[in-house]
Regions:
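Forkhead-associated
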Residues: 31, 35-113, 117
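Intrinsically disordered, low-complexity acidic Ser/Thr-rich regulatory segments
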Residues: 1-65, 122-127
Length: 127
């Protein structure tokens, strides 16, 4: 499930010393359910110039300005579990409030929250 996270946004704004006029929290944000399929799913913003079309495309309104073109990747394990990896995004990726080091693979569980960008959260659900 992809949506916005006000608590994360407020925390990041305070940590970075920004005001809401620097990067405004969206007035609306739909909830998008995206089924996880295949061996990996890229998370980011599509770019025609770079011929990049991530499977979880966050270049839809409201567009989170903190999302990199290739921000993170979800990688499937043979047992059906998923892990997340940040390949070097500009603003980092958090799992359950903890920043994950670039290049580290973090196994995900039901209900885990992946925060990225200025306000985006992806919550992991089965089925």
């Amino acid at each position: 499930m992809v949506t916005s996270d006000r608590v994360y946004y407020d925390r990041m704004q305070a940590m970075r010393g920004l005001s809401s006029s620097d990067v405004a929290f969206p007035a609306y944000a739909s909830r998008r359910r995206i089924p996880l399929v295949g061996k990996q799913m890229r998370i980011g913003r599509r770019s025609a110039a770079r011929e990049l079309q991530p499977e979880i495309d966050l270049a839809v309104p409201p567009i989170d300005p903190g999302i990199s073109r290739l921000h993170a990747m979800l990688i499937a394990a043979p047992d059906g579990t998923w892990s997340v990896l940040d390949p070097g995004s500009a603003n980092g990726t958090l799992v359950n409030g903890r920043e994950i080091p670039t290049g580290d693979l973090v196994t995900l569980n039901e209900g885990d929250r992946i925060n990225l960008g200025a306000w985006t959260v992806i919550t992991m659900y089965r089925g």
